[in-house]
Amino acid sequence: LIRVRSMPKSPCLNLRDIAAVCVALLCSSSALAGDYQNSPQATALISEMTQDYGFADEQLNAVFADAVRKQAILDAISRPAEKTKQWKDYRPIFVTDARISKGVSFWQEHAETLARAENEYGVPAQIIVAIIGVETSYGGNTGSWRVIDALSTLCFDYPPRATFFCQQLKEYLLLARQEQVDPLTVTGSYAGAMGLPQFMPSSFRAYAVDFDNDGHIDIWTNPTDAIGSVANYFKQHGWTEGGEVVSRATVQGD
């Protein structure tokens, strides 16, 4: 008789482990290929952009083949809104010695540009300096999320504000073409705000200006364009030179 010995436990992966590895590899491949490649939502948006704005199918397919869904962005935007704070609560957060020092340096370095913006748009230099300081600490924190990932995630996977973010995604593709920038390389906040003043794409296209007249609008690395854009934004939103900054509110009824 031939005795068959029981097989020793293999040090290799069992079937369950192999299956898990295969799933992981498939997920990794999907992430590398882009989570929105050939998705119905992306396909519909691509169709709209090609028909309405003359984009090439292959161009946008390549963009969305690289766009990645970011769960961390969905988690961040879904958090309950923080309690409303009064100015006395915000002041120590924003008015710090470090930010004041950076603001003074920024003002001194760009004094001529700030004066020109104030003259052309009627917005005081201190207002422009303060806005850029509050938004990004003078370019120190402009966001590290790829804008294409942020806006694709919020357009396609965040139904509560899909209409808004899909419009921003379309505006972003338009501005990337307009300014001849690679839509896969621009970074910003998790909501898609960009540059020193943290403009959303629609604000960029409506209010950003080429303030140094070099033929290109750059609010990411060019403080001159950022300064002019902030001033224009305020002007277009009704800023009145010499007008009231605050006024006493009156309440009628119960």
Regions found by a protein language model. Give the residues of each.
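Cell-wall glycan-active module
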Residues: 3-13, 17-19, 23-166, 171-187, ...
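Functionally critical loop-and-helix segments that line ligand-binding/catalytic clefts
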Residues: 198
